[in-house]
Amino acid sequence: MAMQIRPSLGGCLRHGGAGDHAARRLSRLRAAKVFVPTAVVCVLLCCAPWVMAEITNDAEREPVYILNAMYSTEAYTNEDAKALWTGMDMAFYNSHYKAAGGRPIKILHPDPDQDNLYDIAEVILHSLARQEKLLAVLGPYLDGRLTAALSNADVVQSGLMLIAPFTGSSGVRTWSDSVYFTRAEPMVELKVVLMHIVNRLRARRVAFMRLTGMHFGGEELTYVQDTLTSLLRDPAVLYTVPYSESSVEVDEEAFDAMADTNPQVIIVWAAPVQQVIYFLEKVLTDPRTSSAYVISCSMIQRVVFDVYKRLLSAGSIKPQDGRILASATTSPVSGEGLKYMEVLKAQMSNYIENSGSFDYYPDDDSTETLGRKARSEAPLSRKYTVDEFFQAHPSIAKLMALGWLSGTLVQQTLEQTDWIVNRSTYKAGLFNQNRFVIGGDYVLGDYGGPCEPLAQFLGASCYCNQGGHSSILTVLQNASWDIVPDSSFKYPQSECNSSKSQIVKAVSVLALLNQGYPKLIDAGMQLNEVLPHAFDDNLCKGYKVSSIFLRVETAKAQQLFDAEVSNYSVDIIAGPIFQALDVGEIFVLNPLYNHPQLRTEKRNYVYLMPTLEQQIYVMYSKIDALRTRTDVFEDTAVVLRGYSAQEVVEISEILFKTAGTFNLPDPSVATISFTDSLRGLLSPRAINVVIGMKDGDSAHFANFLAKYTDVMVVVCFDELTMYYEELRATFSVQPTSVQARLMSFSSLPLWTDASAEAKARWPILGHFHKIFPDPINHTPSLLRDVIIAGFIQELVSTTTVAETKLLTNAVYINGGVTTYGFTLGNFEWGCTATTSGDSCVYKNYGASNIEILSIQRMLDPTVPQLSSPSTPTMEYRPRQRSHALTPAQRNGLIAGCVVGAVVLIATCTLLLYCCMDNRNNDAAPKDGDEPVTLLFTDIESSTALWAALPQLMSDAIAAHHRVIRQLVKKYGCYEVKTIGDSFMIACRSAHSAVSLACEIQTKLLKHDWGTEALDRAYREFELARVDTLDDYEPPTARLSEEEYAALWCGLRVRVGIHTGLTDIRYDEVTKGYDYYGDTSNMAARTEAVANGGQVVATEAAWWALSNDERAGIAHTAMGPQGLRGVPFAVEMFQLNAVPGRRHAALRTEIEAILPDDTATDTASSAAGALLSSVETMSDPAAGIAFVLASCFAPYPVAQRVRELQPLLSKWGVGAPPRSRLVSEEDYCQGLMNRLAIRIATVSQARLRLTREDAADGKFKLASSEALNPLAREGDSAAGGVRPRLPGSPVTSLPAGGSSSMREWRVFTRLMNDTQHPSVTHLSQQRPSNLTSFTEAQDAAFPLNAHCGPESRVENSGADDEEIVIVRVSRNPHYARHAFE
């Protein structure tokens, strides 16, 4: 019996019930040898019955032998094994080491002197040899030892039970009647981890760490990858290295490959070995992974805790509460409200106080460091309390709790008298359909052995040797483990393992909370709360809803949204949203805006409630029913509040089109800003439709309706839901005559109707009232949100995976969706082939049976309906002509109109004849042989300013015109024309033009605009561009108030100047002069690339000044710049009219032809019209563009773009991707213009070549030494042309160096001596794709059939246009004109 008193490997004394008593008994026997004879005599003198009874009692109390195999041979896991054994011993101690019938429990421990501790099979067999009546084995510890034990035939044949082994891999969790697992399988822990990653964290980038060559992580990794793949997620990035006892450092190459993906979650699934410790240290300290969630299994929870606490104490990391998690099969020891935990605490307290075997003391190092918890040699006076120990050592305490649960189960089995007779009866008892309840609320089982199929069918547990059926997730907070709320996973008690139970996946529903709109915030928060309550998981194929919200501001909405969807999974966007937000292909369900908007015609946008178009259609179709309540006329007065100019146009078009469909008068439309009041805008004799409510409107409606008894007010459904509480509170105290004349629309059952008839007709209404029984919550917004939840629930049940694209597809595949008897749809999107051609339907809205109802009916459901609900057809017809007039009336009306028209025409003709010659043309340059300096101006972001500040822009534009016209007169220049807010001005001298341009800037700066709103608007525009353009630095938005006031004020005007010969023509219609040709084009395009407040002059205008004039002008040389349609770089000079002003880089070629106000999603037509007026396109090109537009007009815009692609490819015209800020219509027209220019250019070139070849009879080949008009002097051909990107520095030409424009002028002067051109074709490429001009030369092809065999076409780096230029030989004899 010596092995009962040897020290254990874990650092504790060998102890255990009968072992200590046996040692004391052995000493007494040695001392009693002298008394043997006396004892024999005493026995003989006793009676025989007493002797027989004593012998029987001793036999009944024969010890029950249990082997403790819960030990570790590695120093870094000694603490774990020790803690597990301490928990087990705690259970035995509190049962006084007694089995059934009072038999003592004797714990046997391995003998290090006799046993090879590394060979678990040898340890078991040696112990069995020493004690043949050994009943069972506790353990072993770790997967490798369990596998080794089960692989030994002698161990298996011995009939010994291996009870409560501590393992962490699924590979060893197989059926065997020799092992009895008392913890849930590792796969259950993994499933709770995956549920948290997929549903709560929604992380897109997951990493998985495992060590190969161990019984650990293989099956778990396969499950993780399969699950992520089935959910259409990216597979986990791996860190896998072979297990090694010597090479324990981190594999840097493997770690870098993982860390460079910036994982959001790292799953660590390995045994507690040294490699894991080093890996965790690297993960927690590397900047690429330090912010990631680290999730581990319960087996290495203590190791993770130790590494984290050690690094935190050393200052290597900062606290990361909430980012370190671990799965578990039992609650943390800090958990409250659990009966079994209270029992554990009571037994642990008794064990600490009385056993003498608890060797953890408060004056030990409180940090849980491996191998440092052995008892001190000197006796310690104070002991831990249970709570102190739990707080100081949460991970060790949790392992003790696991050991205690297993020990308590073993204790319960040993208390069965008929089980512990021998090993066979013990095994039979263990597998006899057992379920164990510990502490009153912790359940293990059901365990069962082999059984008949019928028994299994009737509910028996068969071939089941494991009992845990649930797991939870714990999180490290303030150096303690807490339960993550709602993080449990469990599977049915009737199942032995979790293989048939999959994780519950969540549908991620995102609500955007716009911080600038409280009503949208309320709607988003309400939806966020309603969805989980209204979503029935049981009806959704293992799915639940995960409702999340994102707080955003308008300026940064796109940036925050893009970050959200790139890092986290989003399946549905529901409710509040921004109209300008680009959501890509994410499914948008029932979007809600700050005020009603027209339907977004995109496939991924789905509307469940009535759209604005549907409501307008229903109103006009039921206008007779509305008029039955009052004597109001059929006129409608519409107030649009808070809408942009473009939105007003679009909504007005729908209003007029719908009114015309029903032959009703067009409505009057009034527009006001969001802050304006309705006072004075509502008509006392019309149907008033208010679109765009704000707080306080309810009281205004009530007062207005009370004052005028023959009017009504109509509000839209979305605003009814947002302002319902205010409307209800205001109108509930009004007379019914007032209540009856406030109208709205709804496709919902009446939410306040709680009658049995209504609930029988509408099951959704009963479901709604069950969730919200309080009548105060019976609102349209809550009912809408319940329907949204039901729609998602039904939609998810029809899909294989709840992924955003599949959900969108499911809407149109199913057509209609019914939830609790409420049908939404029919949804349809696409075309079907018919005998008459394709029939296309694009219907992404599903509201039907739309009713016009009053607030009176909302408050009192017994009020009858105004009219029966209807589903609008949304078919529009042209207004029908009225035939109410008699023929005589019509004839009289026609005659009157004719006479009036004649008189009007005569009057207008006379006025024009008298007044047209009044234009003063004295200042106009009229000599076509003299150079003219043309100056173009334009206001930056004018359209955006009109949309934002319509009340201010009229006066601002008038002031702008006055300033410029005064200066034009002052400098003796000539106003050629104005288009919108743009001027074209002609000057005889370049100095007058330059002085005029500079003084325009200074005058506008000093002008008293009377408001700072214009400057605030420009700041907002620049800040908006920061969010949409990479590397954009706002030039003025971040200036201090003093700096800004000195440099900027009011409208910002850009000016472009160019000097040259022009074609001057007198216009008989306008009685003025106009200027045509390259000079006009160059000046207009120079203005187009400038920024607001900037004056840019070409080198032609600059060098037209005298030396003294140039010396007196502050300027900055900007270097050669590319202009649209100009086949060479043009030297530019910035005139510093206001010293200190800083401008953004010159606008790129594509910016110059796109709308000016891209930051605000508006478009400027003035600049485009001005460019067209100065022959941006040649006459042939314009004609070709007109033909193309006419040919493609019958197709929808998207189809036009597709049909244009082959033509663009054939003609070598590039098609840049469309920006989201450019409409499809503008984009399509731009492509047609490009194609027209190319066709006209090539056609004209061919015509010239044909004529010249006919005259000369030959074609001169290109010279390899031809000048490159796009390169500066001295540049080699290999250098190529590198277009300046936005923001890149500009440099001027070297002193004395001639620019390409001068080379071009010299080149054109040689035209009379030329015979044949050398043709070079510069095809379109993006700047980022440029390498060098040498590379471009490799892609050479002939321009046309007239080219000689040695002529070649080369690619250059033009940013946006494809141009054809002439390359000139250094031999003047071969110089020719360039053509485009």
Swiss-Prot record:
EC number: 4.6.1.1
Reactions listed under catalytic activity: ATP = 3',5'-cyclic AMP + diphosphate
Pfam families per the UniProt record, alphabetical: Guanylate_cyc, Peripla_BP_A-cyclase, Peripla_BP_A-cyclase_1
GO molecular function (one): metal ion binding
Predominant place of localization: membrane
Tagged with keyword Metal-binding: yes
Named cofactor requirement(s): Mg(2+)
InterPro entries reported for this sequence: A/G_cyclase, Adenylyl/Guanylyl_Cyclase_3/4, Nucleotide_cyclase
Gene3D superfamilies per UniProt: 3.40.50.2300, Nucleotide cyclase
Domain Guanylate cyclase: 933-1087
Positions on the Extracellular side per record topology: 56-891
Keyword rRNA-binding: no
Bilayer topology term: Multi-pass membrane protein
Name of the protein described by the UniProt record: Receptor-type adenylate cyclase A
Organism this protein belongs to: Leishmania donovani
Gene for this chain: RAC-A
